[in-house]
Amino acid sequence: MYEFKDYYQNTVQLSFDDQPFSDSPKHVWVICRFGGKWLLTEHEDRGYEFPGGKVEPMECAEEAALREVKEETGARVKSLKYLGQYKVLGKEKVIVKNIYFADIEKLEKQADYFETKGPVLFHELPENLSRNKKFSFIMKDSVLPISLKKLKESGWIE
């Protein structure tokens, strides 16, 4: 297990075990690849980030992950794999979030991308991402680099 501080100095615990913090997490975050590129969305307030959000009532985390990717990017997921889970010990509440890796089959244009401006493709993620004001705070802690390392070790990405 990994432990570190997030952008707002909250303690974050990250594990690649099978749902170590909750078997019914209320949030999801989906690292997406499409045609050898990273698929992100541009949140209207936060900036660039991988798709994600809340698990709705009567919905499991996997269903939420598929829905959020579709809503925020218009993408159809070819395969979705559970990667890990993290817990943010916030000042007011605790958030548990599943991390998934999605291989995207295709992007479809939509009239509405909900609270985002739609899909954004990156050949490479910037090295100075933690200091880049165009990126969301969600992308600026250690969850992303540790998750990318795990994806490479697992052979899911090159």
UniProtKB/Swiss-Prot annotation:
* GO MF annotation, one: metal ion binding
- The broad enzyme category this protein falls into is hydrolase
Q: Tell me the Pfam families matching this sequence.
A: NUDIX (PF00293)
Catalysed reaction, written as an equation: 8-oxo-dGTP + H2O = 8-oxo-dGMP + diphosphate + H(+)
GO cellular component, alphabetical, reads: cytoplasm
Q: Which InterPro entries match?
A: Nudix_hydrolase, NUDIX_hydrolase-like_dom_sf, NUDIX_hydrolase_CS, NUDIX_hydrolase_dom, Nudix_YtkD
Entries under PANTHER family matching the protein: 7,8-DIHYDRO-8-OXOGUANINE TRIPHOSPHATASE, 8-OXO-DGTP DIPHOSPHATASE YTKD-RELATED
**What more does the entry say?**
According to PubMed:14761999, can complement an E.coli mutT mutant. According to PubMed:15576788, cannot complement an E.coli mutT mutant.
Quote the protein name from its UniProt record: Putative 8-oxo-dGTP diphosphatase YtkD
